[in-house]
Amino acid sequence: MKIPLMMVIAAMPLGTLCAADVLPLPEKVACAIADKQAFQQPDRVHLTGWIGSRMEASAKNRLAKINPDRLLMSYEHRPGCQSYDGEHIGKWLHAATLAWVNTGDPELRKKMDQVATGLVKWQLEDGYLGTYNLDGKPWARWTEWDVWTHKYNLIGLITYVRYTGNKELLPACQKMGDLLCKIFGDEPGKLDINTSSAHVGMASGSILEPMLQLYRLTGEKRYLDFAKYVLRAWEQPNGPKIVSVLLEQKRVDKVGNGKAYEMLSCISGITEMYRTTGDPKLLQVCLNAWQDIVSKRLYFTGSTSAAEHFHDDFDLSNTNKVAETCVTVSWLQLNMHLLQLTGESRFAEQLENTVFNHLFAAQLPAGTAWAVFTVMEGKKVYYNSNSTPDVTCCLSSGPRAVALIPCLASSVDSDGVVVNLYDAGTAKLTLRNGKTVVLTTETIYPSDGKIVITVDTESATPFAFKARIPAWSRESTVKLNGKPVKVDKGKDGYAAIKRTWAKGDKVELNFKLEPRVIAGERSNIGKIAIMYGPLVLAADEATLGKEGLPIGAISIGKPDLASLAIKPEPAPEKVKTWPHALVFHCNVIASEKPQEIRLMTFADAGSFEESYKIWLPLSRNVLVDGTETRSRKGDGTGSIIDENETSFVNTSDGTWPKEDWFAVTLKEAKTISRVVLMHGKTLNVGGWFDTSAGKPRIQIQTQSGGEWKDAGELKDYPATTGDKAGPLKEGESFQCQLAAPVEVFGVRVTGKPSFGGNPNQAFSTCAELQAFAK
């Protein structure tokens, strides 16, 4: 995998296929709210730069190579091999159809036809198109992921029908919709949609989105009535209270059980309900959710969620199941909806951040595989068709996001054309007055900040050319036909040039690409991250120098830009994933000696089977070279000095001592001023420190083999008792700042163990014990 990546991508000639040039089936019901920015058909925008290379990799190496028999297997042989196995075919149809419209690939179209007709073949007479059995072995109908599967079958088939014009499959969609209307509702004898799936009904409730699409496509009011029922059901005592909580508390972590993917899927449905009915409070629901995520729950890499859920404010783990790819995709979709509905550039800003960083970081550059979680440090674990399980939810979701990119990369609004994402390529746009404008973009962005866009019109035409000026760009210039022009941002956040345009007019944008240092906060105190333009950078063992340095050896001596001396340079062949890929020179400290290393983009980091890290410590954890011990051996196999917060040790041995401790001793004295403890795991029979007798204490050895002396306590450790862990979370970190720097031969944390629901024993756990000079 390490060497052939560039060979695989280079072998895919961009632009060799022509767009499908389709005319989608029109909707019979007009939306109450017209989009301010128009969703573009994928054949209108062709991207050939870095984004385009990732799109083509996804289309050719994943979507076109899927085995239709695998997608249909769980329908042919009910029940499915996974409880959610039925979702994959609808997700694939959605992504493949969009990709086919963009490329016109005839082989992909053949496979789409085969899959779509093959799926409908297994629809039962009553309209059922899931993978569950009536006898409930092993899954009973209308439980777990059954409605969810119908959601994705509707999304996939509706997309296929609209773009191919194959109306013969529309009745299958209506039969599904009619069955759902018959089964669920608040009338006597019908099932409650809240109790028909996991996650407080949010999985089944996400059927809202395609039912509204089905309503607008067919004009059948019963589908709108069903959608209104779903909204009512959410507010019942057993419902997730999505609308009321987001209007009143404005916190996504308080909605339902906080499950991010399902919740964001429901919120996308709410955008469709607002678009369909015009109820202004529904838009406010979505804006409140967006603002809460952006301000308190978003990784700066452009995704959200940890362990698949929204958590307390700023609770963003670096390693614990970070940013499920399904959540990344749903976050991108929400921003696309809000960009359409409001026309505001702040949503396009989020799109760029997500696409260039966390979305592409989850995708193997060759397009063949996707990560389920994409951690901020560690290794990426990719899944493809040869993985076990052979199809994960994220492997099916990722290509959907990639296929959606051209739909809003460029767009039109009531003023003219809008450019949201920058990549080489062309966009053929139709103004509101019916005239055609073609934009041809020449750039190697984001490797260079120069972007030249040629505007071609059928005749001299007045309209506004709107460009998104990235928020990170401190210096931006705009030229029109070679001459500088001053443009101010409008209320929508875009810089607009309003004039009568002629064929061949050129707009030149220059954004100053420069490094930025991001200071770590909360659990990342004592660390920095580095960005270059829109790109998040990472240290990867694949580019750490001839010595093959381990990632744990790297620290930042001085965090100012002058000392770091970050400079872009062409990527070496072994890590070049597209022709203009860059790596970035950076001065660091490696094993306490000055060292030059090369950083790479987060999007590419980890794709060469090596460990990587985004947050770089200002000083090295001095305990990683030590020897760890604990008060009792316990029954775990982890470590407290492996720099992995998901690995932990415990002291469980069936006894109940007054105190537990975890220690690391050193052969040579090291100067420290700060100690960090990361909690291990909270179990129903203990695993935490009981603070009823006092907060956990930090102790040190100032002589080799000497006595342990108290040096401070973990004041930020939460209030707990022997049987209650309080708000403690797995991998949560706590810090003790020492009164003054001190030379030590050992560090340990000491506290009272907990017993949970078994008072006949007590134990504690620890994921990491760290000590730093700064």
Label each PLM-derived region with a short phrase:
Residues 642-714, 728-774:
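Aromatic, loop-rich ligand-recognition surfaces of beta-strand-rich domains
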Residues 464, 506-508, 746-748:
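Short, conserved beta-strand segments of beta-strand-rich sandwich/propeller modules, principally
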Residues 6-16:
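Bacterial N-terminal signal peptides
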